[in-house]
Amino acid sequence: MNHSNLANPTVSLTVTLIPKHPIRHLTSPIPNRNFTNPKLLFPLRLNETPSSSLAAKRVFIVRATVDGDGKTGNWVNRLPIPGLGAENVFRLISSATGSPIGQFISSPVTFLHSVDPRIKLVWLLTLVVLPARANLVVRLGLVLCTALLSILVLPRQVWIDQLARVSLLSGILFITLGLGSDGAPPMLQSRTPPSSITSLPNLPMSLSGYSYMLLKLGPLQFTRKGLSVGSTAACLTFIIFQSASICLATTTPEQLALALRWFLFPLTYIGVPVSEIILTLLLSLRFINLVFDEVRSVSLGIVSRRVNWQQLTVLETLDIFASFIRRIFKNIFRHAEQISQAMIVRGFRGESSSHKIYFFSGSSNKFADFASVLCLIGVISTALLSEYFLV
């Protein structure tokens, strides 16, 4: 029997699905600018195929670096911070070391150039002690006098650069110590019984308007203790740095060494090696100029090469900074070796007492010395009298 002619049995079943809730469109409404006519993005109905409803497709490509000619992009140089650029760092170093910091300025010649260096050292000691012991008015007066003296004595570009940096450092110290010394209020519990128990009226906090807290910034508070600590540190920093800079700018290293030797000479009777100390100080003051010159010349050499920092990686940039520091130390050690060889050629054998050191110092002006001593006495008298009248 041939079974190929027989038909296969089939069963047909009709199923009708009635949903309990109405079918909604799976849409994502996105309003326009006026928020009045919302539009539907990619409407998806049950009677449509996914290929027709999801025709638009957005492709996202994630890249870690910038592509270009098969090279790895330097993501550090593309940070939105312009101060992180290596070239900007080298330019700042070259400009900072370009101004004479702690160096003698021979011109223009001012009245401070003719003052005796021993009087200048006494002035330095006075300007260190007075701000720490005087009140706020005297401190601010000394700061203003030091700033005015810098403007009168130093060249314009020099005093602008120095005053800006010292003022920035002093301002940071004032804000930090002013808010940090007594900024967090202590959690104290009063031991005085309330007025309801003692049957005494509440007394005012102050009869003369005195207030310990001067300013309140959220959780921080600026008190009188913070004002005292911050002003003392800021004024001391400004006066010490700027007065030392003025002294070094108007006095040669030989004059400073001779003045310090005059003050330390009585210590030779108790065995203090004054000659070695003075020689070390003289060499240190002479060596400051060499250090600044080397830092400036090496940084300018790197800037003048016009290195394309955008194509360098982080390790390559760090390698350039390491070579920069290594080159500076190499040049400094070479200069130190040359100085030692020059001293040996001139007969120095390591004993300062047996080797004669000639201090070439110009003659001071008697009128300038007398005026400086009078000003010194006036400043000390004003600081002492302020403790009795300015309370």
Swiss-Prot record:
Presence of the UniProt keyword Hydrolase in the record: no
Q: Name one GO cellular component term.
A: plasma membrane
Q: Which Pfam families match?
A: CbiQ
What keywords does the record list, in alphabetical order? Answer: Chloroplast, Membrane, Plastid, Transit peptide, Transmembrane, Transmembrane helix
Its membrane topology: Multi-pass membrane protein
Localization per Swiss-Prot or TrEMBL = Plastid, Chloroplast; Membrane
Q: Which residues cross the membrane?
A: 134-154, 168-188, 229-249, 263-283, 370-390
Q: Which domain of life is it from?
A: Eukaryota
Return the transit peptide range from the UniProt record: 1-63
Give the chief site where it resides: plastid
Q: What is this protein called?
A: Protein ABCI12, chloroplastic
**What is this organism's lineage?**
Eukaryota, Viridiplantae, Streptophyta, Embryophyta, Tracheophyta
